[in-house]
């Protein structure tokens, strides 16, 4: 048997290749997972864009091939898989798992730190990587899990967890002085939270939480073609295009939550808003315009790392309370986002190598319908 892998060139992520590798016999303590399906979103493009800086390439390292013209990498994705072989006494064949997988049709893991709810991949190369990404949830006891919502879980769960943590991080820090309680955000009063790439799932998940905070106006920034979609969500007080920054008074206290990673936009915001309190860099949906944050006016652009906030809150609240709050927030969000009468997301399925390649190219361009979420599979038939 062979494993089919979807690889990208690390320094030119628009260049891709499909490569088969022979399956080796399992060592003691290993399991083989058939990766059933996985989500592909702008968040995964961020993983690739920051692959070296944030160690995303290290999760599923790619051995060099004689035909490679440059170093290749495997983008991590969130999805579901089934245990098809096991040499570990604590993991049974047939178990369904949710977690962090490569863009492939199978993967070998080495379960460690087993509990009834989950295990961690204890492979040596992942020991230095953050535990949040090494955990695999056992679906039969996962509090997030319902069989009918698997696609939505794969598409939105990791993004919403990040969104929830960004909202919590900003509130935890009192919006770095931008929040002005006693003001009416609906009237354009108080501080401002500017969210770029407002149509992205992580951005609107963040806005969903932020809008409930007093004293802060949530303003989504997007391209002209996505204004109507963003406005239809109802989670932004206002939606503006990227060239409408002058619609916000230059002296208003604000924080910038940058999902786009667009260097020109970041410079424009840092230059216009003299009372910018904090600049939070989340990702890079605008891959063609990624740039650094050096020599900017105002505060330094600071990369948000979700596991740090997880660790802080788990310490303060306790792991059980942290998990309880996160699950409650998830179901509150999906109740709105998955309302059949007005869904925020519809699912498109892409099965087979050619379909996966085409879907990746579309997501990389960042010009698709923001209401569509892409579920991919290299194990299902076309």
Question: How would you name each of these model-derived features?
Answer:
Residues 203-204:
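N-terminal Rossmann-fold NAD(P) dinucleotide-binding loop
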Residues 100-191:
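NAD(P)H dinucleotide-binding glycine-rich loop of Rossmann-like/cofactor-binding domains
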Residues 268-336:
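Glycine-rich phosphate-binding loop and adjacent beta-alpha segment
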Residues 9-38, 42-44, 49:
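A short N-terminal beta-strand-loop micro-motif at the entrance of redox/enzyme domains
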Residues 211-266:
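Adenosine-nucleotide cofactor-binding segment
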Residues 192-197:
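Conserved N-terminal Rossmann-fold NAD(P)-binding element of oxidoreductases
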Residues 26-38, 52-108, 113:
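Glycine-rich beta-strand-centered segment in the early N-terminal region that forms part
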Residues 310-382:
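C-terminal hydrophobic helical "lid"/dimerization subdomain
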